Amino acid sequence: MFEKALASIREAIYAILAPASLPPGAATPSGGTAFMIAPGLLVTAARCVPGGSGPGNRPCPGLSLVRAPDIGRGTEPATLVTLDRGKGLALLRIEAPRSGASLRLLDAPVPIGTPCAYSGFPRLAMDPAPLPGASLIEMFQGASVSSFARTQGPGGKPVSRYTTDAPLVGDASGCPGFTASGEVFGMLDCPPGDLRSAAPSWVPSMDIVSFALDNGVPLPART
């Protein structure tokens, strides 16, 4: 069901490479996933930006990314455009991207029960150092949308979230969730703590669209 969609999704997903200095010959761990929503502009989870999850921390302004089809061909530098801890979102920019492939964001909720999937690069712990042999691991997981709810977030602001019914595959924050058509319905934002008992939580695509437009990102027109 998702074979064609996954092929197009992979063209626009990126691994965020951990910024820690690694010894020569060491494996390259992932710091999470980002995906392109307009040429040169990407969205990820705030927690995937080093220093982005803690309110007292200063986010790292520069990152190194590698697009899924380009693994083994070199990385691309990216800069942080803006970060909103309340929404759990961050925007990144690649000034001269090798590829302009971007994903289409849905502008309305999907029905409960919609078959979906997600793909990307689970985050690996960097404190104090990568696990021996840990490296970039690209994963795919199928699921169904199980709920859509609006709750009160930080500062009393309303927050919308989807949940899905399949267990989490590690901390896959930043992964795009997509339907069989290849359209993105949300971005996975894993809660801190024990992921084995956590329900997958998704920032809805509508919130990503609003976040992007509020920050001057010209999203491609829908056809």
Language model regions located:
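C-terminal subregion of chymotrypsin/trypsin-like serine protease catalytic domains
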Residues: 6, 37, 178-223
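Terminal peptide-recognition signature
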Residues: 16, 34, 40, 44, ...
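Catalytic-histidine neighborhood of serine endopeptidases
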Residues: 31, 38-85
